[in-house]
Amino acid sequence: MFYRISLYAGILSLGAAALISSGRLAADNEPANNQPADEISGNYLETRTCDVYTGPCFANAQVGLTGRQAIMAWNIETGTHEGTDLSGLNVVLVIRAADTLGFGGTVVVRPDPIKSVILVDERATDAQRAALASFVKRHAARVTGDVVRVASLPIEMRFDLIDMECRLEAGKEARLVTRRLVARDRCCTNEEIFYPPLTEVEHSAPAFTIDGGFAGRGLGQTWSNPKTRSSFLATFAY
C-alpha cells in the first residue's frame, strides 16, 4: 500500500512539474511585453537569368551556364517585422551566385558563395530600413549570402496579378516589366515550372519578362534578361 501511495504521489509530482515546465515554455514563447506576433503580407516579384518556365531539355542545357543572377522584390501591403511597421514599403534583393540558383534536377550545382545587394525604399525611416534589411535576410536566408551593399533609393512596384502585368523600378539599378505567358511563348510541348521561386510565397505563377536587369554597383557585374520566360509573380504572408 505504501508503495502504491508513493508511486501515485510521484506521478502527481511529475505531472505538476510538467505543467509548471509547460507553463514556463509557453510564457517564454510569448512575445515580449505581450506584443502580438509579427504578421506581414503583400505582393512578390522575382526574375532570374534563366527560363523558369521551360522544358527539361532547355533547362538541362542552361544549368551551370545561366541562372546565377536573380532579383527578388517584396511589395509590403501591410504588417510589421520585429515590431516595426513596414506597411506600404518596398524592398529588393539582387543576387549573384557561383552557380545556377535553385536548380532541382539531377545535376549537382553549388551556388555558394553568393553575394547580394539589398535595395530599401527611400521613404523608410532609419528603423524601417533596418527592419527591411532584416526582413529580407530572414525570408530569403538561403540565397542572401554575403550582403555587400545596402542602398536606399526610390522603389516603385505596380502589380496586376490578373493580367500578370507588373513593373519594378528601383532607382536606376533594378528594373523588371512582365506580362502574361501566351501560346506563342512556348518552344516545345513540355514546358513546366522547372525552377520554383527562391523564397516561400503563395499563389505563384510564371510570367514573361519583357524587360529586366540590374545596373547597380556591388556585385562586380550587371545584366539584363529581356524577352525570356524568367519571372514569377506571387503573394506572400508570413
List PLM regions with ranges.
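Sequence contexts marking disulfide-bonded cysteines in secreted/extracellular proteins
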Residues: 49-51, 56-58, 165-167, 186-189
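Processing junctions and N-termini across compartments
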Residues: 44, 51, 160, 181-182
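Short, surface-exposed beta-strand/loop "edge" segments at domain boundaries and coil↔beta transitions
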Residues: 77-85, 100-102, 123-132, 165, ...
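Bacterial N-terminal signal peptides that target proteins for export
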Residues: 1-12
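Extended, charged low-complexity segments
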Residues: 176, 181-238
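Signal peptide processing junction and immediate N-terminal pro/mature segment
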Residues: 19-31
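N-terminal Sec/ER secretory leader and immediately downstream segment
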Residues: 34-105, 109-117
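Extracellular-facing segments of soluble proteins and assemblies that are Gly/Ser/Thr-biased and enriched
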Residues: 98-163
